[in-house]
UniProtKB/Swiss-Prot annotation:
CDD domains linked to this entry: DHQS
Domain of life: Bacteria
Enzyme Commission (EC) number: 4.2.3.4
Taxonomic placement: Bacteria, Pseudomonadati, Pseudomonadota, Betaproteobacteria, Neisseriales
Swiss-Prot/TrEMBL keywords: Amino-acid biosynthesis, Aromatic amino acid biosynthesis, Cobalt, Cytoplasm, Lyase, Metal-binding, NAD, Nucleotide-binding, Zinc
UniProt binding sites for NAD(+): 71-76, 105-109, 129-130, 142, 151, 169-172
Cofactor mode of binding and number, as noted: Binds 1 divalent metal cation per subunit. Can use either Co(2+) or Zn(2+).
Cofactor: NAD(+); Co(2+); Zn(2+)
Protein name: 3-dehydroquinate synthase
Gene Ontology molecular function terms on file: 3-dehydroquinate synthase activity; metal ion binding; nucleotide binding
PANTHER family in UniProt: 3-DEHYDROQUINATE SYNTHASE, 3-DEHYDROQUINATE SYNTHASE, CHLOROPLASTIC
Length: 359
């Protein structure tokens, strides 16, 4: 097992990474749990892992109840959030009841937002079961639900008490979900660590077959990079925005196609290539870097191009992006592979040229 600590102005918390951790969850998480916990999961994850977690909590002497939600990005909304609140209140959850998010990014984001707002703040713990959530969304305290006009538009910064990433849960992940998670892994190398990017180019076949040593190293490195960035910029006033590489274009794809049609990681993959193309238009990164990024994404079974839709629709979706400031769109681009940069765009003709092959 590998561990690291996330340090933020609000508080510090551990991340546990390894195999076979879920049966040990009671003992590992006991210092971060109250006397009672609410396990919140979905219909897909519950049959696989809920029983193991319940047994682990029983062994640690932690009482618990469970709330099982519908699965999928399409359910990341007010209606499902209210199902969480219904379950908490029906079970008389108190402010000190620990909410445990058992699932992927959708569960983690919603449970975190529920924790941030239930009785003005309850503790919560992340137990991510997908690659995407283990390397990205479970760490750093971003919580949210979607709105029909934009992804993750309603939420809060609210840090967990701990994160437990059991890599064994990835063995039940569909191949498409594994690829989607790998988009976020590749993103880290592209935005801030060329050495890691080159390592991914060498080890992608082993990663896609979930070989234990390289997988542990990849998840650890991603969490380490995110922890370092979050420690410097908890509420995304500066460099934390780098973590949104590919997300402005990607969120537009998700919103246009309908949440869940393209998986988040698939949209981010195409978005990363578009961000590199935009950087080319601005005279920053090279066409060779863009091609190299696209090739690595394709090696992970990911799309390197977005679906085709009208430029006006792209603009409409991107105008709702959370990075828009003073009406000016802000994109995360690349100076070169391994070096992200925040770019303000006032000339939409540059965006049109970037997107022209997909209009």
């Amino acid at each position: 097992m590998k561990t690291l600590t996330v340090h933020t102005p609000s508080h510090s918390y551990p991340i546990f990474i390894g195999n076979g951790l879920l049966p040990q969850a009671g003992s590992l998480l006991k210092p971060h749990l109250g006397k009672r916990a609410a396990i919140i999961t979905n219909e897909t994850v519950a049959p696989l892992y809920l029983g193991t977690l319940q047994t682990a909590l029983d062994a640690a002497g932690v009482s618990h109840f469970s709330i099982i939600l519908p699965d999928g990005e399409a359910h990341k909304n007010w209606q499902t959030l209210n199902l969480i609140f219904d379950g908490l209140m029906q079970n008389r959850a108190e402010r000190k009841t620990t909410l445990i998010a058992l699932g992927g990014g959708v569960i983690g984001d919603m449970v975190g937002f529920a924790a941030a707002t239930y009785q003005r703040g309850a503790p919560f713990i992340q137990i991510p079961t997908t690659l995407l959530s283990q390397v990205d969304s479970s760490v750093g305290g971003k919580t949210a639900i979607n709105h029909p006009l934009g992804k993750n538009m309603i939420g809060a910064f609210y840090q967990p008490q701990a994160v437990l990433a059991d890599l064994d849960t990835l063995h039940t992940l569909p191949a498409r979900e594994l690829s989607a998670g790998m988009a976020e892994v590749i993103k880290y190398g592209a935005l801030g660590d060329i050495g890691f990017f080159e390592w991914l180019e060498q080890h992608m076949p082993e990663l896609m077959t979930l070989e234990r040593a390289p997988l542990t190293q990849a998840v650890y490195r991603c969490c380490q990079m995110k922890a370092d960035i979050v420690a410097q910029d908890e509420t995304e006033q500066g460099i934390r925005a780098w973590l949104n590489l590919g997300h402005t274009f990607g969120h537009a794809v998700e919103a246009e196609m309908g949440y869940g049609v393209w998986l988040h990681g698939e949209a981010v993959a195409a978005g990363c290539v578009l961000a590199a193309r935009l950087s080319e238009q601005l005279g920053k990164t090279s066409a060779a870097d863009t091609a190299r990024l696209a090739a690595l994404l394709e090696a992970a079974g990911l799309p390197s191009a977005p679906p085709v839709f009208a430029f006006e629709k792209w603009l409409a979706h991107m105008s709702h992006d959370k990075k828009v400031s003073g009406g000016i769109m802000r994109f995360i681009g690349l100076n070169r592979l391994g070096e992200a940069v925040i770019t303000e765009i006032t000339d939409t003709d540059i965006l049109r040229r970037t997107l022209q092959p997909y209009l």
